[in-house]
Amino acid sequence: MKPITITDDNFEQEVLKSNLPVLVDFWAVWCGPCKMIAPIVEQLAAEYDGKLKVGKLDVDNNQQSAIKYGVRSIPTLLIFKDGKVVDTIIGAVPKPMIVNKIEPLLKTA
């Protein structure tokens, strides 16, 4: 499974109303570190299919969501559960760091 495209228009439905925890990658086309983390985000979408929803939000085209959640630098990964932000990861970080943040959420799902 590939990451879904999150927009200002579908944010509430795809993220806030999701029955699964959601990892949202706030990114932009021109962002070098975003390109570095993109393959990791794709791997997580495949590996956690059915347990975690993974989405990507282009901040240039969806500024409303980025502003609402205080995203000031990219890449920023926000992890939502039950409609609330439960964790934040800023920057291109190694995959194990992201996994360590999402695994505990899956055990309580």
Features from the language model and the residues they span:
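Conserved Rossmann-like nucleotide-binding pocket used by diverse enzymes
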Residues: 2, 7, 27, 53-55
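A short beta-strand-turn-helix
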Residues: 3-22, 63
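Short pre-active-site segment immediately N-terminal to redox-active cysteine/selenocysteine motifs
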Residues: 19-20, 26-30, 73
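Conserved helix-turn-beta segment immediately C-terminal to the redox Cys motif
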Residues: 19-21, 38-57
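Conserved redox-active cysteine motifs that mediate thiol-disulfide chemistry
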Residues: 26-40
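Structural microenvironment flanking redox-active thiols in thiol-disulfide oxidoreductases
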Residues: 59-66
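Non-catalytic, surface beta->alpha helical segment in thiol-disulfide oxidoreductase systems
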Residues: 79-109
